[in-house]
Design a protein with these regions (language model features):
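Bacterial N-terminal signal peptides
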Residues: 1-6
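Mature catalytic core of soluble alpha/beta enzymes
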Residues: 7-295
């Protein structure tokens, strides 16, 4: 998980909030921008949260197999972005995992075997500004994309020259340089310290962080993605973590715009060239741990 270490001192307003089921941190040049950022994020949460019965996502789920539901441009953009990631990730990211995570595991409406049969992003039907899930008991779970997507939407709506937003394992830095760290998932210490060289969105996934991820049995502990877009960073980190190793490497090769840092159980790491392009400094905890690098 990512952790704030330090910041070049500039006039700013900092505040922590509880958003989207976790703690968030917003840092803006003024108190007004800070309040505006929170309001935008809260508004997005009321549309996308599957824990809010009146949200657009919850209403889509309630109408699965029955009716089309007219949705806002925000919800539509999130769904379309999720479908795009599903297509690029060979289906290892699938927002309709909600049949399993929501309807089977949380609400106990159906059994897990039936739920897995209902997971298929191709059964999301879009007609104009309306959405419907093709089969009853299908469900959208925005957990693998929602936080990063919300941060990105907030960044676009704020029109602020600089800022920092962090929600759980997702963050975006723009208009300034900042020292951040990737924690070692085995002991919570700092594994890599980094200073960004450009605006960047960062997302970290691991099954200890994100219970909505169905994972293969391999030696990956954690995946951190750096990308220009927060929604893509969030969804790609989810997808890459869920993939088996052979498919993971193919995806990374086929998508050079996605920066990837992978932590393995033996302490080794994998970093691709794109990840390093987002940072002017990368400092590793020790030289004793075996490292895997790809340039």
């Amino acid at each position: 998980i990512l952790q704030l270490i330090s910041l070049i001192l500039l006039p700013q307003q900092k505040k922590s909030y509880y958003l989207m089921g976790t703690y968030s941190y917003i840092e803006m040049p003024s108190a007004d921008l800070n309040k505006k950022a929170y309001k935008i994020l809260h508004d997005i949460e009321t549309k996308l949260s599957d824990y809010i019965d009146s949200s657009e996502v919850s209403r889509i789920n309630a109408n699965a197999g029955k009716n089309f539901l007219k949705v806002s441009s925000i919800t539509m953009e999130m769904i379309k972005k999720a479908i795009e990631v599903s297509e690029k990730s060979f289906g290892y990211f699938d927002i309709t995992i909600g049949a399993l995570t929501i309807n089977a595991k949380r609400l106990k409406k159906i059994d897990e075997f039936r739920a897995k049969e209902l997971v298929n992003f191709k059964d999301i039907l879009i007609k104009g500004d309306s959405v419907m899930l093709k089969r009853e008991n299908m469900a959208i779970d925005p957990g693998g994309i929602g936080k990063g997507f919300a941060i990105e939407m907030c960044y676009k709506k704020l029109n602020s020259k600089k800022g920092f937003i962090s929600i759980g394992g997702d963050m975006k830095i723009w208009g300034h340089k900042r020292t951040i760290a990737v924690r070692d998932p085995r002991n919570g210490t700092s594994l890599v310290q980094m200073v960004n060289s450009k605006d960047v969105s960062i997302s970290t996934s691991g099954n200890y962080l994100r219970k909505h991820i169905e994972t293969p049995e391999d030696d990956v502990l954690q995946v951190t993605v750096a990308h220009e877009d927060g929604g893509f960073a969030d969804a790609y980190s989810t997808a890459i973590f869920a993939m088996p190793e052979k498919m993971r490497r193919k995806f990374i090769e086929d998508n050079p715009d996605v920066g990837v840092l992978i932590v393995y159980k033996d302490g080794s790491i994998f970093i691709n060239k794109r990840f390093m392009e987002f940072f002017e400094i990368l400092l590793f905890k020790t030289n004793s741990e075996k490292q895997r690098r790809k340039n």
